[in-house]
């Protein structure tokens, strides 16, 4: 064993350094780059070029004529590409990196490769997992893969772009050469296109180098994504001519299922300040009626400038992969920022590869056919005629509203068109031209259609309501109404009740109290003398083709107003309820919650409806004529005098003449006439008469009682008492024919039974109590409910009734 000495160690180091310098001379690099290389950089580059040489030497030679392009021509083509070429193995080992990478990342190829021989050394650590997933995803060798990641850039470039550069990678795996190493590490060749907001300048608006060497077309949009300019290459991917798409809304080409995703990214682009970008994976409709997956990258050129979009046509599998990646990034951003309510990238679950590749038969209509999706409560919209000649936009873009062409439109519509604006990010699609860009209103915007109306609720873009506000691009707008609906608040009524209303603690969203609503005209017809249920009224309004409804009747859905005065006058016109107030307090009952437009017709309440404030006898259909009322009063007086006569013996005058007829009534039958020698009437304790006026329940035509029933009531009570001495054996004391009266010989038991019978309550008297039940409002509370024990000479009660 030889002991290492100082001289031997130095000799070995010198030998290793000499070999490294020899390797440096073999590297295909410029002399200027070789001078800057360290020993570690030289060894790293040597490994890369060795793997590259082995792979291409053992691979299958390219088919085709040799000498078609020279080496210099190939280098020129690679240098002209709008990106750089990248070759690496499945485990991430680099094989090749083109020289053009320095134009996009700021680093030269030598600087990047010198950092390490793995692709993970030159990409952002946050995207390592994405690249690993793409490299391990099983698929056929000829299947393209498309994903995006961020590459490290130089310090100077990072200062300009505020971070690493986002790069779109498209590539595929190649057949590996023979060998165990290549069998486990297939080679992936990719073209990397930096996603730049300002690609290399091309000759005017036509195709530039980016569109020549990459499947891509560019477009410029207004703030509402109306197309201002588009590349001619759109003809290749969508089949449209450039002139056919100018002044059209970009939303008109979108698939209905992608509206929410696109609008959310559009809002994010407009809401954030600075140099930001928005990404989306959507389906655009081709001229043939099919759908093409497009990866869109949008940049805003300042707060007043237009929006630039780079559109990359992708396959179904690439769309599925990109959607997964975008969704995962949004989820991670929400977790890091601690904001779970981030903008959703996609409204629904991520589509599978089969769903992306399969054609949806529901959306295969031709381009010329109307394309729309019906919403339950959305108003119908009208289509602008395609034959209308609309002005072309000038080169100096003006983002103010455009006027409608003159025509036989109502003056109301012309007046409304000046106040209505198009709120981004939604622009309705009108096939007639670009007049819709800045002059039509939102379909769900709350607007009161009155001739002098200037009320307009500007819809602020919200992340939670985009999917509810967006309608398909071919949706049509209705003509404004020339008169308000029946029961709908007008501008005058809105101002009147807003001045008289104050907030209340009780909340009734989307509804108005009947006392605060002002109706255009009274409902006086008998057909309207009945309350219309809300569901019936709402359905009736929906069935009307010429009526539109605001989403809410209240101008501010977060505030509810109630009248300042008490609610007593409200209850004067409504039926009584257990919670009806008596002292003017406001007691509100719960109202049903209805989604959508609320329109309820409230006609006048019938005049004769029972209320606590008015006695039933005072209502119109309870009135009697003067003659009928006089007859009823005389009958009551006669019954009262008959009841008083039972408490004292009949006098001689009464015995000789009988009862005098009262009030012109015919005299009673002779069977009731008693002689002076007769016995007195039984002194029975009769049950006090209840003085509730229940006569209004009877039919006025059959109100008068005949004399015969009155005789039957007092027949047995007027017979003489056998216990008194009134001349035994007197023939006058006997009844007709000499037969004794049936009440002559009564035992004490029979006498007690008659007393009980006189005080017995019938079933009707027992059921009708003098006092109301608990929780029951006595509708007849103004009538006297106290029991009267005696009557005056004139027949009135002991105490006044009212």
From Swiss-Prot:
- Please, which domain of life does this record's source organism belong to? Eukaryota
- InterPro entries attached to this UniProt entry: bHLH_dom (IPR011598), bHLH_NPAS4 (IPR056192), PAS (IPR000014), PAS-like_dom_sf (IPR035965), PAS_fold_3 (IPR013655)
| Known outcome of mutating residue 472 to S | Does not affect the transcription factor activity
Q: Which tissues does the record link to its expression?
A: Brain.
Q: Which chain positions lie within coiled-coil regions?
A: 5-38, 624-648
Outcome reported for the amino acid change (mutating residue 208 to C): Does not affect the transcription factor activity
- Domain PAC stretches: 278-317
Q: What is this protein's record name?
A: Neuronal PAS domain-containing protein 4
Which gene codes for it?
NPAS4
């Amino acid at each position: 064993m030889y002991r290492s000495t100082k001289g031997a160690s130095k000799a070995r180091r010198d030998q290793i350094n000499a070999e490294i310098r020899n390797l440096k001379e073999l590297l295909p690099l410029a002399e200027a780059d070789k001078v800057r290389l360290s020993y570690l950089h030289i060894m790293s580059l040597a490994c890369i070029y060795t793997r590259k040489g082995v792979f291409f030497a053992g691979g299958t030679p390219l088919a085709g004529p040799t000498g078609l392009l020279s080496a210099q021509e190939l280098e020129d083509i690679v240098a002209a590409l709008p990106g750089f070429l990248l070759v690496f193995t499945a485990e991430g080992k680099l094989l090749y990196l083109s020289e053009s990478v320095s134009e996009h990342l700021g680093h030269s190829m030598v600087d990047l490769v010198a950092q390490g021989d793995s692709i993970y050394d030159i990409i952002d650590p946050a995207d390592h997992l994405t690249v690993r997933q793409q490299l391990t995803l099983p698929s056929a060798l000829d299947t393209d893969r498309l994903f995006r990641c961020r590459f490290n850039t130089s310090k100077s470039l990072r200062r300009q772009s505020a971070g690493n550069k986002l790069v779109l990678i498209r590539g595929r795996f190649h057949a590996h050469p023979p060998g165990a190493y290549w069998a486990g590490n297939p080679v992936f060749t990719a073209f990397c296109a930096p996603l730049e907001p300002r690609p290399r300048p091309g000759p005017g608006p036509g195709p530039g180098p980016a569109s020549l060497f990459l499947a891509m077309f560019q477009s410029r949009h207004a703030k509402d994504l109306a197309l201002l300019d588009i590349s001619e290459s759109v003809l290749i991917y969508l089949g449209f001519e450039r002139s056919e798409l100018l002044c059209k809304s970009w939303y008109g080409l979108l698939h209905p299922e992608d509206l929410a995703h696109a609008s959310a990214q559009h809002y994010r682009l407009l809401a954030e300040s600075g140099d930001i970008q928005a990404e989306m994976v959507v389906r655009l409709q081709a001229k043939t009626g099919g759908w093409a997956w497009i990866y869109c990258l949008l940049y805003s050129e300042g707060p007043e400038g237009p929006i630039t979009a780079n559109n990359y046509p992708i396959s179904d599998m690439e769309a599925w992969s990109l959607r997964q990646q975008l969704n995962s990034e949004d989820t991670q951003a929400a977790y890091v920022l601690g904001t779970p309510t981030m903008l959703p990238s996609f409204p629904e679950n991520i589509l599978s590869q089969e769903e992306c590749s399969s054609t949806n038969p529901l959306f295969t209509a031709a381009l010329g056919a109307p394309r729309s999706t019906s919403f339950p409560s959305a108003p119908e919209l009208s289509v602008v005629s395609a034959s209308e000649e609309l002005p072309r936009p000038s080169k100096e873009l003006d983002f103010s509203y455009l006027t409608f062409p003159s025509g036989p439109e109502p003056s109301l519509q012309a007046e409304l068109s000046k106040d209505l604006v198009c709120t981004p990010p939604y622009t309705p699609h009108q096939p007639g031209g670009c007049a819709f860009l800045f002059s039509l209103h939102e379909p769900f915007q709350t607007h009161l259609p009155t001739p002098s109306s200037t009320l307009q609720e500007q819809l602020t873009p919200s992340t939670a309501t985009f999917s509810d506000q967006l309608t398909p691009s071919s949706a049509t707008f209705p003509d404004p109404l020339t008169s308000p609906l029946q029961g709908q608040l007008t501008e005058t009524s809105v101002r009147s009740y807003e001045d008289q209303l104050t907030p209340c603690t009780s909340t009734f969203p989307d509804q108005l109290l009947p006392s605060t609503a002002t109706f255009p005209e009274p409902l006086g017809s008998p057909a309207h003398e009945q309350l219309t249920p809300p569901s019936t009224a709402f359905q009736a309004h929906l069935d009307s083709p010429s009526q539109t409804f605001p989403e809410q009747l209240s101008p501010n859905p977060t505030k509810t107003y109630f009248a300042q005065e008490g609610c007593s006058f409200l209850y004067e016109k409504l039926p009584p309820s257990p919670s009806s107030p008596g002292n003017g307090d406001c007691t509100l009952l719960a109202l049903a919650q209805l989604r959508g437009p609320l329109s309820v017709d409230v006609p006048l309440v019938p005049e004769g409806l029972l209320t606590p404030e008015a006695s039933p006898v005072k209502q119109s259909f309870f009135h009697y004529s003067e003659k009928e009322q006089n007859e009823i009063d005389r009958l009551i007086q006669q019954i009262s005098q008959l009841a008083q006569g039972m408490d004292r013996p009949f006098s001689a005058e009464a015995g000789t003449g009988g009862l005098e007829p009262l009030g012109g009534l015919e005299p009673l039958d002779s069977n009731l006439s008693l002689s002076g020698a007769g016995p007195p009437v039984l002194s029975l304790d009769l049950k006090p008469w209840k003085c509730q006026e229940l006569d209004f329940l009877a039919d006025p035509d059959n109100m008068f009682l005949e004399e015969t029933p009155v005789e039957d009531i007092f027949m047995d009570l007027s017979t003489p008492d056998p216990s008194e001495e009134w001349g035994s054996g007197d023939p006058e004391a006997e009844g007709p024919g000499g037969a004794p009266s049936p009440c002559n010989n009564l035992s004490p038991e029979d006498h007690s039974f008659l007393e009980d019978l006189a005080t017995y309550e019938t079933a009707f008297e027992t059921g009708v109590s003098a006092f109301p039940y608990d929780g029951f409002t006595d509708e007849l509370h103004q009538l006297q409910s106290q029991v009267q024990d005696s009557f005056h000479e004139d027949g009135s009660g002991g105490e006044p009734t009212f």
